[in-house]
């Protein structure tokens, strides 16, 4: 049987994984096997959290709009119902930005749709 030399290939593979796990704590950044496991787990988390990020931002926008609306005696669901019926196509992100950055304009906007 002929000899198979794999030193360079595995060293490059190990180095690649260890570079990806820089900044991890303990053995997760020093030992190849644990680093490889942590790297795979981190990639799974990053994949899942890219999808969760969209949900979380939507929740944040809804919370912000709801808090701003309640100051003027509205309910969030009633407010959205009025928006839909008056064919106003502002999304939750824009409404939240208006409520936070420009409350005067937001107040005028609410009074105009009442």
Swiss-Prot record:
**PROSITE patterns according to UniProt:** RIBOSOMAL_L20
The cross-references to InterPro entries, in alphabetical order and at most eight, read: Ribosomal_bL20, RIBOSOMAL_L20_CS, Ribosomal_protein_bL20_C
> NCBIfam families attached here?
rplT_bact
Q: Which organism is it from?
A: Tetradesmus obliquus (Green alga)
Listed A to Z, the keywords are: Chloroplast, Plastid, Ribonucleoprotein, Ribosomal protein, RNA-binding, rRNA-binding
Please give the GO cellular component terms listed in this UniProt entry. chloroplast; ribonucleoprotein complex; ribosome
Protein's cellular compartments: Plastid, Chloroplast
Family recorded in the similarity comment: Belongs to the bacterial ribosomal protein bL20 family.
Say yes or no: keyword Isomerase present. no
Region forming the signal peptide: none
The keyword Ribosomal protein is assigned to this record? yes
Q: Which GO terms describe its biological process?
A: ribosomal large subunit assembly; translation
List the Gene Ontology MF annotations in alphabetical order: rRNA binding; structural constituent of ribosome
Query: What function does the entry list?
Result: Binds directly to 23S ribosomal RNA and is necessary for the in vitro assembly process of the 50S ribosomal subunit. It is not involved in the protein synthesizing functions of that subunit.
Source domain of life: Eukaryota
- Species classification: Eukaryota, Viridiplantae, Chlorophyta, core chlorophytes, Chlorophyceae
CDD domains for this protein: Ribosomal_L20
Q: What name does the UniProt record give this protein?
A: Large ribosomal subunit protein bL20c
Q: Note one Pfam family from the annotation.
A: Ribosomal_L20
């Amino acid at each position: 049987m002929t000899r198979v030399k794999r030193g360079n290939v595995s060293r490059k593979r190990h180095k690649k994984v260890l570079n990806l796990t820089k900044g991890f704590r303990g053995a997760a950044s020093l030992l190849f096997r644990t680093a490889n496991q942590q790297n795979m787990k981190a990639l799974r988390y990053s994949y899942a959290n890219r999808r969760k990020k969209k949900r979380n931002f939507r929740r944040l926008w809804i919370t912000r709009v709801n808090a701003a609306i309640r100051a003027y005696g509205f309910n969030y669901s009633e407010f959205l119902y009025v928006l839909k019926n008056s064919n106003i196509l502002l999304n939750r992100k824009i409404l939240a930005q208006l409520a936070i950055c420009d409350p005067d304009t937001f107040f005028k906007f609410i009074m105009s749709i009442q």
